[in-house]
Amino acid sequence: MDTILHQTKSAFEFNFLYVIESLDVNDGDTLTGTELLKKLKPYAEQCKALSTALISVENAQQFREAMDFLRDKAAEGQRPVVHFEIHGTDAKDGLYIKNGDVIEWPEVLHSISEINYASGCNLLASFAVCYGQYLAQFINAGKRMPFCISLGSFEELYEDDLELRFFAFYKELLTSFNIDKAYQALLDADPNMPSNYSLIKADVLFANVIKDYLDTQCSRTALKLRAEDEMNANPAKFGHFTKEQRRQFIKDFRRCEREHHEQYYKESVEEYFQLREHPENKNRFLILDSTDALLQTFDE
């Protein structure tokens, strides 16, 4: 099956643009997903390898069926871009479906992760959804990446603004096939409104999650506190330790934990980037050999 290849780090192939829409005209909504596909039609027609489709969902069951359909199509060889035109909940905890059903972020994350896995780590997921990027807080670096790239906002979105921005984004993407140019087009599309959008690439996200883990759990101070907590929690084993023995235990504890988190890092890299199933991902994504190498990128 033909695909369009975008060549950068976090590169992805796509040959199908799906718009998942769950909006209610009776509640004053404009069918912005429907309108987006209409406006993109001439640009999509120029891409012979690209097809488009609108999937309207009325309730949670239909949403789940749509996600299963996209997963199965990806397994058959499609490389979908999935664009969501759905309300986000006021609680920022998920998607608000047309009939009032709520799909919470962990379920959304699981669904798109399955699509991404089936597509060989090629999923671009875009969210014309209020608070859509809150989904990222549930990502675990020790599990398979849920997408190649995610586009959305941590803020409330407004209909006119998102229409302008996502049209500009997809118009540029279908013209230049460059995700960074497309994102810049989105940022520049509406000078009358502040841009609250973010583009999250899977490899950059992984690096940030690992750095946060190292900073909070594996710093020199954090390891000292954990070693002291272990000794204090086991007086029968450590209560007789001299000051020098306690100091040596802390030193040994740090060394063992550093070896452990290096092993954890290597295992996480293999799982997150799906290197067993897709060894080519080693070259597709920015993957560093060690935690030291990863941390150095934040110092540059």
Positions of predicted regions on the chain:
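Glycine-rich loops and low-complexity Gly/Arg-rich segments
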Residues: 42-46, 76-80, 107-109, 150-153, ...
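Catalytic cores of nucleophile-dependent amide-cleaving enzymes
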Residues: 98-164
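A conserved mid-domain beta-alpha-beta active-site/ligand-binding segment of alpha/beta enzyme cores
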Residues: 175-261
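Extended non-globular C-terminal regions
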Residues: 236-300
